[in-house]
Amino acid sequence: MLTRISSFHNYQSVQNDLRRQENKVHHNQEQLASGKKLLKPSDDPLASYYIQNISQQQEQLQQYLSSIVLVRNRLENHEVNIANAENFADESKRLTMEMINGAFSAEDRQAKKRELEEIANNFLNLVNSQDESGNYVFAGTKPKSQPFYRDKDGSVQYAGDDYQRKMKVSSMLEMPMNDPGSKLFMEIPNPFGDYQPNYDLQNGSELLLNRATNVDTKDDAEYRVTFVDMNNGKFGYQLERNGKVVDADEFSPEKGIEYKGLKVHVKGQITPGDSIEIEKRAEFSIFDTFKDAMAWSDKSVSDTSATAKLHQMTEEFHAAFIHLNKARTDAGARLSTLDIQEQNHEDFNLSLAKAKSNFEDLDYSKAVIEFSENSRALQASQQAFGKTKDLTLFNYI
């Protein structure tokens, strides 16, 4: 009796096994060639999801790192410009102090005025400087518009805005890359407090305002203090508010002058008849200080009121220097924050790369062993397939 053998079934089974082994070997070869454990998402869907998520985080980190480089370049340029402005303010203070020198002739003072005028022009050029992209550094968020210009009266006006340009350098931090020129150069704290002085001094007087403050922020009145000789070796004062006498008393240098919320302190030698008018001003513009210093330098060297105003200009230039120095320190602090943020991003990026490597990168020693095992299995399948292919019923007759 003939024995029936399902040769087709055996042939198909061995052929399928051969194909499976061939696919495994090809997969091992592709892994070894690419160095990657996962060649397509279907190899491990969960691992592929994590890899995709990590890649997105790495891409975001790279954007932050690129932003940090850009902001750092802008801030470093900003810091240098502020430092140059500091130097101009300090040099202007020195020149103005020299103008006060009583031994100076009118010609000497005019020579110093010309130097100051040159500094003022250079200062205006500096505050209108542009970065490598053509953006005006001190224009706030209007970088394409020149921020400072002189009007027909010679006063400097501001055409920018009061905001900072910012860029996102992390998910939680937007870093300012500039400071508006209005804040830096036109809103400088008044070194005399809440008021600025106007002097009407007698010959030989050395009287100067030291400080004047008022706790009543709504009091916008102008005050005038006039000093008189009390004929007892002391001075008295008369205080006017908007032209009306509101107080009179013996003057005490230690106590100063007090009226309601107003406090006025002076320094220097008083001459009977000296008068100081004070008007409200919490902040000042360094451009006005340049203009005023040059205007008062035209006065006679013997004009004590003009000399007192030049003293005021030296104090304002010094206050501007302090104000700019603080702004430069703030810019330096931002640069330090950028360095810290950059290091944090790089550390996190390294952690992500390690995590991604665990999911994605090939363990070569393990892969070589697997390739060797699959190659031997393929060889066995090929031998089995060869025998099955040659099998016929005549072998059993």
Where in the sequence are the language-model features?
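Amphipathic alpha-helical polymerization modules
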Residues: 1-153, 175, 291-397
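Cysteine-poor, low-complexity segments in flexible/peripheral regions
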Residues: 142-303
